[in-house]
Amino acid sequence: MKPSLQLRLSQHLALTPQLQQSIRLLQLSTLELQQEVEQALTENPLLERENDWIESPLRVAADGSVNLQSAPAPAPAEPQGNGEARADGAADDDSYGDSGNGDDYGSSDWSLDDFARRPQGDEDEKTPMQLREAEPTLREYLMEQLTPLKISARDKGLAIFLIESLDDDGYLSASLEEICTELPEELEFEIEEVHAILTLLQSFDPPGVGARNAAECLALQLRRLTHPQRELALNIVTNHLELLAVRDYTRLKKALQVDEAALKSAHELIRSLAPYPGHAYSRPEADFVVPDVFVRKGGGGWIAQLNPDVMPRLRINDMYAQILRGAKGESGTAGLQQKLQEARWLIKNIQQRFDKILRVSQAIVERQKNFFSHGEIAMRPLVLREIADTLGLHESTISRVTTNKYMATPMGTFELKYFFGSHVSTETGGAASSTAIRALIKQLIGAEDPRNPLSDSRIAELLGEQGFVVARRTVAKYREALKIPAVNLRKSL
């Protein structure tokens, strides 16, 4: 084959660094965005924080587009409508406009406005988590009870070892034999000694601490009570706990030879006990969610409003901008010029990130407005494509916006993805949100007769009477998702 040269014209999609950064920032959570900004501030001398609080320039126009207007100077009065979306969403241009290669290096034109003023708070006030951390842990509380006891150093050391061996529920999961093998051999502890100190530990508060299983935990608590049915309750937790767990009241009455009234009284006594005595002293990991968007009522409807506290306040460093302006075209400034470009990209991409979050949030609010007034039962079916088509964005963009972004509403704080979901058919040919169906199932079970609880089949029939076509297995799936026990486990005397 003879070698030859050919000219071919073709097109291919190339992601510019600016677009790549925009996509990456869009899918970051609030915490991840803060970390990204901190890293950029460390690495880029052209970038700095804006310390002044400025009113938001972000506005949603009547056609659904978002405009960034020049921000007025801060006024003493509280600004109105900061970072709010008030209109129906409409298609927007998802492009970047200019390429960011202009010569304007002034800091004001490239400042990422704060969109709203931050409320002043009392820094001296302790948070609920700080107050929680001030309370003693289970081990600290047990040590407080052990310290004043006049027992030998050997016994006290063994008691401390047992306290350290408890799990967070207050149980001793290791057997006495295992405890003995873990103790120093030279001390030659016998099982009887370990059992004696464990008995001492089980006399401490909270009642039930140091138990080796659920039956022993409940029995330890019952022995401290005075109740007409205490002995019957002790018999149940010691010998028939498995029957009580499955609510087999018929076999229980037969095994105990008691009437229904006595069994019911003993059951209520057992239910008043704490199966996990250590929980009251546990310190769960902080699981706080900072909302990206607030929803409030106003203007005859519901309005989405950006949370100003999660918005980075960035601008171009004035000093370096002046240096670059004066040294324009000179050699040796290429590095700073690149840093300037990166700073401008970051500021603009963060602006566009919050632009999309606001517009998507408002579109969700307008479609789920009944939810904000009536709760889950009023949730309507919604898919990502519906929002994407309305706003003129790609479905993948909506997915990125709704992942790890949270909305604070009168009904609670939810991830934006919460407002989307599958649907079930109705008899009229329409569709109902699976979230609304789950709420209905929860409502039906909450109103059931505990002596004759509703089966999954009966719940499906009741939903059918309301016009929802739901199979029994679907009811079971939704019930399990709600962590509601099966019908036999919900039955009571």
UniProtKB/Swiss-Prot annotation:
PROSITE patterns: SIGMA54_1, SIGMA54_2, SIGMA54_3
Pfam families for the chain: Sigma54_AID (PF00309), Sigma54_CBD (PF04963), Sigma54_DBD (PF04552)
Coiled coil regions, renumbered to chain: none
Name of the protein: RNA polymerase sigma-54 factor
Source organism of the structure: Cupriavidus necator (strain ATCC 17699 / DSM 428 / KCTC 22496 / NCIMB 10442 / H16 / Stanier 337)
Family of the protein in this entry: Belongs to the sigma-54 factor family.
DNA-binding interval(s): 383-402
Domain of life: Bacteria
Keyword Nucleotidyltransferase among UniProt keywords: yes
Region named Disordered: 68-131
PANTHER family xrefs: RNA POLYMERASE SIGMA-54 FACTOR (PTHR32248:SF4)
Keywords: DNA-binding, DNA-directed RNA polymerase, Nucleotidyltransferase, Sigma factor, Transcription, Transcription regulation, Transferase
Residue interval(s) of motif RPON box: 471-479
GO cellular component, one term: DNA-directed RNA polymerase complex
A GO biological process held by the record: DNA-templated transcription initiation
Chain's role: Sigma factors are initiation factors that promote the attachment of RNA polymerase to specific initiation sites and are then released.
